[in-house]
Amino acid sequence: MKLHELKPAQGSRKTRNRVGRGSSSGNGKTAGRGQKGQKARSGGNIRSGFEGGQTPLFRRLPKRGFTNINAKEYALVNLDQLNVFEDGAEVTPVVLVETGIVKAEKSGIKILGNGELTKKLTVKAAKFSKSAEAAIIAKGGSIEVI
């Protein structure tokens, strides 16, 4: 047997059903689209949420809220994530991005107090939660708001 003689196993492949190719095929004339109407036409489809002309739900409900264009989004780092650094190390936003703890700086870094810190560190970030601040200082480390 050679490569060009290989064939799939009998019955493992089903031939594609070609519609609209004569009435004797069983799928000629209307090609499985029924009779006339929007869905029988080319490009004829109804958008999602269409309710047959009735005012759709998304238009019956009131608009609500807005997006504040001045909102700052901080990259969040928990205390237990800082344990990867050596004792006495200086942790800056640049170092956090390089080590892969944070993907991007965004509007700055905020240190949160989740988890337990086991090392003395000097942490520089834009914001600190009160619990994170207390935990870093309790371990003999220092914080610096940048």
UniProtKB/Swiss-Prot annotation:
Annotated spans, Disordered:
1-57
Q: Does the keyword rRNA processing apply?
A: no
- Single Gene Ontology MF annotation: rRNA binding
**Gene3D superfamilies from the xrefs?**
3.100.10.10
GO BP, one annotated term: translation
| Keywords, in A-Z order | Ribonucleoprotein, Ribosomal protein, RNA-binding, rRNA-binding
Q: Where is the composition biased (Gly residues)?
A: 23-35
Write out the function statement from the record.
Binds to the 23S rRNA.
PANTHER family listed in its UniProt record: 50S RIBOSOMAL PROTEIN L15, LARGE RIBOSOMAL SUBUNIT PROTEIN UL15M
Please give the name of this protein: Large ribosomal subunit protein uL15
